[in-house]
Regions:
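Extended, small-residue-rich solenoid/repeat segments and analogous flexible loops
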Residues: 1-60
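Glycine-rich hexapeptide-repeat left-handed beta-helix
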Residues: 47, 58-183
Length: 183
């Protein structure tokens, strides 16, 4: 643990299988489990849970974040406050800053995801595997965007607030603008 900062060791749980690199910081009430790796300069917590995941150099796992098995955060990626990631890859400089769920997804480099955005990938039929969502590089995902997997969204795509993406979107597209309904 040379060069690692554990802000409050009494409230932090780190299993012996976890790897922490120099200059990483673990904030209070954080749980690191399994084959988790936290790279140089990364920060985790407070109140975060990371299980069997890779946290890249200078990446941030924010407060109350749950990072589940199979997740990889690239260099300088951010999984912010109240974010859950499962089997998801955030490439370098990708950000999911707050209040989002991304499962079985890939988020390209430089992409920013607005609050309340999710991937919907569960098929309740027995034996049906979960589907993936792929979002390209430098996309701008507005608040409350839902991706219904399987779906692929290209590079430099923008979504409007409250958009439901149910089919593939080409590069450089603007998608959304659901009609207003008064009931």
């Amino acid at each position: 643990l040379a060069g690692v900062t554990i802000v409050d060791p009494q409230t932090t749980w780190i299993e012996p299988t976890v790897t922490l690199e120099a200059d990483s910081v673990v904030h209070p009430f954080t749980l690191l489990r399994g084959e988790t790796t936290v790279a140089e300069g990364a920060q985790v917590g407070p109140h975060a849970v990371v299980v069997d995941a890779e946290i890249g150099a200078a990446a941030i796992v924010g407060p109350f974040c749950y990072v589940r098995p199979g997740t990889v955060l690239g260099a300088r990626a951010k999984a912010g406050t109240f974010v859950e990631l499962k089997n998801t890859r955030l490439d370098e400089d990708a950000k999911v800053p707050h209040l989002s769920y991304f499962g079985d997804a890939e988020v390209g480099a430089g992409t920013n995801v607005g609050a309340g955005s999710i991937t919907a990938n569960l098929d309740h039929r027995p034996g049906v595997p979960k589907k993936r969502t792929v979002i390209g590089r430098n996309a701008r995902v507005a608040v409350d965007t839902m991706f219904v997997a399987p779906v692929t969204v290209g590079d430099d795509v923008w979504t409007a607030a409250a958009t439901v993406v149910t089919e593939d979107v080409p590069d450089n597209a603007l998608v959304g603008f659901p009609p207003r309904q008064t009931i």
